[in-house]
Amino acid sequence: MLEGHESYDTENFYFREIRKNLQEVDFQWKDGEINYKEGPMTHKNNLTGQRVRHSQGDVENKHMENQLILRFQSGLGELQKFQTAEKIYGCNQIERTVNNCFLASPLQRIFPGVQTNISRKYGNDFLQLSLPTQDEKTHIREKPYIGNECGKAFRVSSSLINHQMIHTTEKPYRCNESGKAFHRGSLLTVHQIVHTRGKPYQCDVCGRIFRQNSDLVNHRRSHTGDKPYICNECGKSFSKSSHLAVHQRIHTGEKPYKCNRCGKCFSQSSSLATHQTVHTGDKPYKCNECGKTFKRNSSLTAHHIIHAGKKPYTCDVCGKVFYQNSQLVRHQIIHTGETPYKCNECGKVFFQRSRLAGHRRIHTGEKPYKCNECGKVFSQHSHLAVHQRVHTGEKPYKCNECGKAFNWGSLLTVHQRIHTGEKPYKCNVCGKVFNYGGYLSVHMRCHTGEKPLHCNKCGMVFTYYSCLARHQRMHTGEKPYKCNVCGKVFIDSGNLSIHRRSHTGEKPFQCNECGKVFSYYSCLARHRKIHTGEKPYKCNDCGKAYTQRSSLTKHLVIHTGENPYHCNEFGEAFIQSSKLARYHRNPTGEKPHKCSECGRTFSHKTSLVYHQRRHTGEMPYKCIECGKVFNSTTTLARHRRIHTGEKPYKCNECGKVFRYRSGLARHWSIHTGEKPYKCNECGKAFRVRSILLNHQMMHTGEKPYKCNECGKAFIERSNLVYHQRNHTGEKPYKCMECGKAFGRRSCLTKHQRIHSSEKPYKCNECGKSYISRSGLTKHQIKHAGENLTTKLNVERPLDVVLTSGIPK
C-alpha cells in the first residue's frame, strides 16, 4: 500500500510552473488530502518511501501549517499559475481530480486538518484575504500566448514553448539509459520510471499490470465501456481525452505535424512518423517466423495472427471472420451501407477516410509515392508497394487449396472464391452474380450502355479497358505475345493462353449440369444457356431473343437491310462476315472438288469430305450419352438436343418451340399458308423443299437409299434409318413413365398419350376424341357408312322398303 502511495505521489502529481520553494508544500498538501479522503491517517509516506507512524501525522500538519503561513502570501502568484497550469500527463483520472480541485476555492482545497488549525489561530479572514479577486480570475482564464505556426493559444508561456516543439520536432530531453528523446522534461521523468521501477498497478479484471496508475485507469475503461469525453460538435464519445483532442482536429482542420521532406501535414504525430518511413524506407519491425518487415508495430502484430491461423474478429451479421479488428470495421459498413466521407469535388462518397484521401489525388493529380527502381510515381502508397513486387518478384499471398501465389491479398481473396463458389456481388437488373466487385461494375455497363474508354487515335469508344488495349495494338501493329511451340504471335495474352490449349488439349471449363468440358470459357457460357434457357440478347424491333450477341447482330441486319460486309475486289456485299469469307474462298462460284464415287461437285473441300463419308460409312463423331455416331459435328450437335431437351427455335405466332430450324420453317408455313415449292409433274405444292424433293422421287421412281441387309430401297433417308432398326432391334426412344422403348419418335409420342390421356384427334360429327389419327380415320369410316345407308333409305320408294321387310 505504501509503495502505491509513493508511486502515486511521484508519478501522478508533477505540475508545471511551480517554483521549487513551493513544491514541497504542494506535494505534502496533496498527500494529506489523499490520506484524509481515505480515512484516518494510519500510515503515511514521504518522498523517500520511509514508513511513518500515525503520531507523526500531527507533526506534519504542524509543519505544513507553518510553511503555509510563511509562504502563502508570497506564493499566491505562483499558486494561481498552479491552479491554471496544464496537466503534464494524459491521465484522465488525474485530470478529473485536478479539475475538481480547481473548481473548488483555495480554502476548500486545503484539507480540513490544516484549514482548522489555521482558522483557529489566525481566523477565517486570513484565508479569505488570500483569495484571488474576480478580475484576477478573469485574467487567469485568458490565453495570451499564441503559437505562430497554428494559432493555438495557451495561458502559460511554458505551455506554448512545449507546444512549439511539436512543429520543430525538437526533443531536447533525452534518457541516459535508453537514449529515447522527449518534447518535455515531465515526459522524460515519467519514462525514467520504466528503468527504475516495475509495474505496480494491476487490473482486477484481467490481471494486466501497468507502470502508471493513469494507464490502469485508462485500461479499466476497456472493461467498463466508459467514454466520458464527448465531442461538442458531433457528440462522439471517447475513453481518453487525448483521443478526443485528436478527433476534434477533424472539425477544426488542424494539422500541426508537418513533414520536413515534402511539406505534407498531419493531424497526429503517429501519422507523421508513419509517413516519414515512406521517405526513409525504414521497416524496423521484423517477423521472427517469415522474416517479413513492417513500418508499424501494429502491422507486425496483425501479421502474427496469420501465422497463428486465428481470425478472432467475427461479423455478427454474416459470420465472416477477420484477422484484424480494422478489417471487421471496414466490412461491417457493407451491411450498414454507411458512406460518411464525401468528395467536395465530384460528390462521390466513401466508407473510409483513407479511400477519400486517395480519391482526392485524382482531382489534384498528386502522386507522392515514387519507385526507387524505375522512377514510376503513384497516387497511393499501397499501389507503390504492390508495384515494387514487380521488381522483387514477391508473391506473398498463397492459396492453401491449390498453392497458387499472388502479389495482392485482394487477388487471393477473389481467387479463393473459385474454390468456395462464393459470388457475393449480384446485378440488380438481371440477377447475374459475380465473385469480384470489379466484374459487377464492368458488367453494369452492359445495361447502362456506358463506354467510358476512348481511343486517342481514332476516337472509337469501348466498354472495357481490355478491348481498348487490344484495339490500340491494331494501330501500333504490336503483337507482344508469342507461342513457344509454333511461334504464332498474338495481340493479347488471353488469346495466347487460349491458343496454347490447341497444343495441350486442355479443357479446363466444365459444365456443372452435364459434366461436358470446354477449352474456352465462352464456349462453356454459351453451352450453359442450353440448360438455363437464357436468351439475354433481345431485338428491340421485333422482340426476338438470342443466346449470343453475335446472333443478335446478324439478326438486326434483317431490319436495317444493311449488307455491312463488302468484298473490296469484286464489290459484293453480304449480311454476315462468314458469308463474305466463304465468298472470298470461292468468288467465281466454281465447284472444283468432285466426288470420285458419284461425280457430285462441291465448292469447298470440307463439304466434299463430309459427302464422302456417306459412301464410306465413316462416322467419327460419337454421342457420349447413347453412343450413336455421326459423320459431322453439326449433326452430332443437333442430335444432342434429344438428350438435353433443348428446343432453341420458337414460333413468334403461337409460341411453339422446335429442336431444329427446319422444323420451325415447316411450321411457320402453317400460319402463312404459303406453299412455295411446286411439283412440275402434277402441280402439287409443298411448304418445305425437302418434301418436294421426296415427292418428285415418286414420279421418277428413284429410291436412292438402300438397305445393306435386305436390299430394300427407300425414297427418304429417314425411312431407311427406321427400317434398319428392324434388323438391329434398336429402339432409342424410351418412355420415362413405363420404360417401354420404340424405334420411332412418332410411336413414342403416340404411346405417351396413354399416360397423359391426351386425345388430340376429334371427330367433327360426334365430338369423340382419339389418341392417334388412324383411330380417328377408322371411326370416321363408320360415320361414312351410316350416312351412306341413310342416303340409300331415303332414295328407295316406300313400297320397296315395306316389301323388303315382308318375308317370302
Curated annotation (Swiss-Prot):
Localisation per UniProt entry: Nucleus
Q: Where does the record put the Glycyl lysine isopeptide (Lys-Gly) (interchain with G-Cter in SUMO2) cross-link?
A: 137, 554, 579, 791
Q: Which GO terms describe its biological process?
A: regulation of transcription by RNA polymerase II
- Keyword set includes Ubl conjugation: yes
Which InterPro entries does the record cross-reference, listed alphabetically?
Zinc_finger, Znf_C2H2_sf, Znf_C2H2_type
Q: Which UniProt keywords apply?
A: DNA-binding, Isopeptide bond, Metal-binding, Nucleus, Repeat, Transcription, Transcription regulation, Ubl conjugation, Zinc, Zinc-finger
What GO cellular component term, any one, is given?
A: nucleus
Gene3D superfamilies the record matches: Classic Zinc Finger
User: PROSITE patterns in the record, alphabetically?
Assistant: ZINC_FINGER_C2H2_1 (PS00028), ZINC_FINGER_C2H2_2 (PS50157)
List the Pfam families.
Answer: zf-C2H2, zf-C2H2_6
- What would you give as a GO molecular function for this chain, any one? zinc ion binding
Zinc finger region(s), C2H2-type = 145-167, 173-195, 201-223, 229-251, 257-279, 285-307, 313-335, 341-363, 369-391, 397-419, 425-447, 453-475, 481-503, 509-531, 537-559, 565-587, 593-615, 621-643, 649-671, 677-699, 705-727, 733-755, 761-783
**Per its UniProt entry, which superkingdom is the organism in?**
Eukaryota
Tell me the function of this protein.
May be involved in transcriptional regulation.
Return the similarity comment: Belongs to the krueppel C2H2-type zinc-finger protein family.
Q: What PANTHER family does the record tag this protein with? A: PR DOMAIN ZINC FINGER PROTEIN, ZINC FINGER PROTEIN 154-LIKE
Q: What is this protein called?
A: Zinc finger protein 841
Organism name: Homo sapiens (Human)
What's the encoding gene here? ZNF841
